[in-house]
Amino acid sequence: MVEETAEFPIDSEVSNSTEADDDDDDFAGDHSPPLDMLVETSGAIYDALTLIGLLEAVDKPGEFEIHTFAYLSCLLHIYDGHPASSWGYSFSAVPPALPFSATLSSTLENLLSMGLLTRSHDESASPTEGSIEVLADSHSAIRLELTAAGKQEQKFLSSLEVMRHREKYLKAAGSTSLVYSVPAVVNSLVYEPQLWQAARTVGARKLLVAISSRPLYDQFEALKDALGRDAHHLSVPATVYVGYLEESARGDFNPSDQTE
């Protein structure tokens, strides 16, 4: 088993209070350029633009898919040895078992109002199958896409040194959609230990809090043992981890039991 001081440093500050995330709601009405917005939302701006750009090449994503791939990116950030609190914004689990960030949600709305994103309704879309079909019924047909201005802004943000450390996590998370479908990745993440535990509780629950993170530590430790601990492209552990979670989805068991 991994000690609490292991290389996956999720700490008690990881998941900020809901009040802290709610403070970001004021951001939704700000129409100033992205770089002039609050410092704590800059990562969310870059993440949203980058993930939409990556995923729209495969299948134009909806908002809840952006939240899920951003959460997967944060997990890879942790896998790479960084504390989740340094990701820049926190996540909560919302029923039935999806990761959600108030910061990211308000960022998407602001980018839409600024003309950096467009929102369309896909009449041909069918509800996502599996454990998230409740949300899929109302959201699966809503698609997000970068505008020309959005692509230009993403390119500019990518050139900034302060954003470059995020790029490899976003790209690795996005690469899983080339192996599995976007809905399959979303459904698989439901079996991530934090989300699995949240599905057994009532109401929203903060994610990546130290006291509940031992199963995630153990999964990542086992993954590093299997793949080797030398530096390697993060798309490999990302794809293997999603594949493991997909296997979990095919059976009815608690993924945290696999590490005991």
What are these regions (language model features)?
Residues 2-260:
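Domain-edge interaction signal
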